[in-house]
């Protein structure tokens, strides 16, 4: 006698994407550290031309401070205190990578046991960028002279959310670099900050809007964003969702 085979039918609902506006408010200062063109040049000179690392240049705290931030408006031509101050007075705007905010949320949800793995959380929501780039120094490789030139004030593609804040301040930190040596870093710090996130999710997906908000909230508390964040044994970059 032939055994009857049972069949099951599964309904796959079409994705229904919706967006929500979420305001996150900083609970602790946000420290930013964009990749410095000078540091990148040292790496590339060794890898492209086989040059040994040059004697370290004298530190310029003001320049390092300005270069550490993601400028949404053009940087001043001269990275000195007076020029930077004028840009602040003229309403200079700054951003932060959307990917870092999303990663904080995913890491927190995974560590809290809300998902079996991080991969399943990545398509659950997207953070839509306010702008798709920022101003900073970039590099140009010259094979004829075997040199790498720094090109200032270049618009570099990267998804960014705008930081709503008082003008940033310069902070000085003692850090340990990869070889264990001590170094001093000068970076931008935003003390009273917020961001308005545009979050897109699938209404017919596994996670509801409330779930997504809880995941983002957990990211702000358990992981944080930026340098010396809670995820990295620090106290900075924590945030919460402002209730409507």
Q: Where are the language model's segments positioned?
A:
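RNA-interacting cores
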Residues: 1-244
């Amino acid at each position: 006698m032939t055994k009857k085979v049972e069949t099951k039918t599964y309904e796959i609902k079409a994705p229904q994407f919706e967006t929500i506006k979420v305001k996150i408010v900083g609970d602790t200062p946000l420290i930013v550290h964009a990749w410095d063109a000078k540091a990148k040049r040292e790496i590339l000179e060794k890898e492209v031309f086989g040059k040994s690392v040059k004697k370290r240049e004298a530190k310029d705290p003001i320049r390092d401070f300005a270069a550490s931030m993601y400028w949404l408006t053009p940087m001043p031509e001269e990275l000195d205190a007076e020029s930077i101050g004028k840009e602040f007075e003229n309403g200079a705007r700054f951003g932060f990578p959307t990917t870092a905010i999303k990663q904080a949320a995913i890491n927190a949800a995974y560590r809290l046991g809300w998902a079996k793995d991080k991969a399943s959380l990545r398509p659950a929501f997207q953070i839509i960028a306010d702008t798709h780039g920022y101003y900073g120094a970039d590099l140009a490789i010259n094979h004829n002279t075997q040199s790498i030139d720094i090109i200032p004030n270049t618009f570099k593609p990267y998804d960014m959310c705008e930081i709503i804040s008082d003008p940033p301040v310069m902070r000085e930190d003692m850090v340990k670099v990869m070889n264990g040596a001590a170094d001093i870093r000068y970076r931008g710090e935003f003390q009273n900050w917020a961001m308005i996130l545009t979050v897109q999710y699938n209404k017919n997906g596994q996670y509801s809007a409330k779930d997504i908000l809880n995941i983002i909230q957990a990211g702000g508390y358990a992981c944080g964003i930026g340098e010396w964040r809670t995820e990295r044994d620090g106290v900075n970059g924590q945030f919460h969702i402002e209730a409507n």
